[in-house]
Amino acid sequence: MNKPIKTITVALAAIASMSVQQTEACTRATYIGPDNTVITGRTMDWKEDLMSNIYVFPRGMQRAGYNKGNTVNWTSKYGSVIAAGYDIGTCDGMNEKGLVASLLFLPESVYHRPGDNRPIMGISIWTQYVLDNFATVREAVDELKKESFRIDAPDLPNGAASTLHLAITDETGNTAVLEYIDGNLEIHEGKQYQVMTNSPKYE
């Protein structure tokens, strides 16, 4: 067995083993091999069926961050393959440039700022916005740190709060964790952020 295949096989086995452990939290992990192989995987430890479906989206799609009013509009630069949660929003995906995005639960999330009138971005399309527009983590961070929109996060179909945080990794293994805490976006970027779970927030 050659080295790249062996490395990928070992990493996939490790990720698979995480998914069968008895846990109460979703976990996302990125493996960076000695030959710069980058593999990202996650578990989905949720209390019910998320009714997920897989979708393939081409580049050139017209998008809106919200279904009415003051919102963000864009045309997708990159095609992507995604998994939808409750079949209404993008939870996980990878675009054609190798950018991977994963949305996980974070009870500490607070999106709201008093008197905030920035354009609205629905939590259900936030992940897709990143996949549509950015080829690398650095590109995404440079834009998202401007905080040019606010997140609207209605409750999930089962009544749970949509308190979520986002992790993105590019083909180099660079990763960013994005969390809304007290109405402000906190970004942690670097190859050292290889694991993300639910609570607590990053410090």
Q: Model-derived features: where do they sit?
A:
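A contiguous strand-loop segment
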Residues: 25-118, 146-147, 151
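Extended amphipathic alpha-helical segments with heptad-repeat/coiled-coil character used for oligomerization
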Residues: 157-203
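Alpha/propeptide regions of enzymes that mature by internal proteolysis
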Residues: 117-150
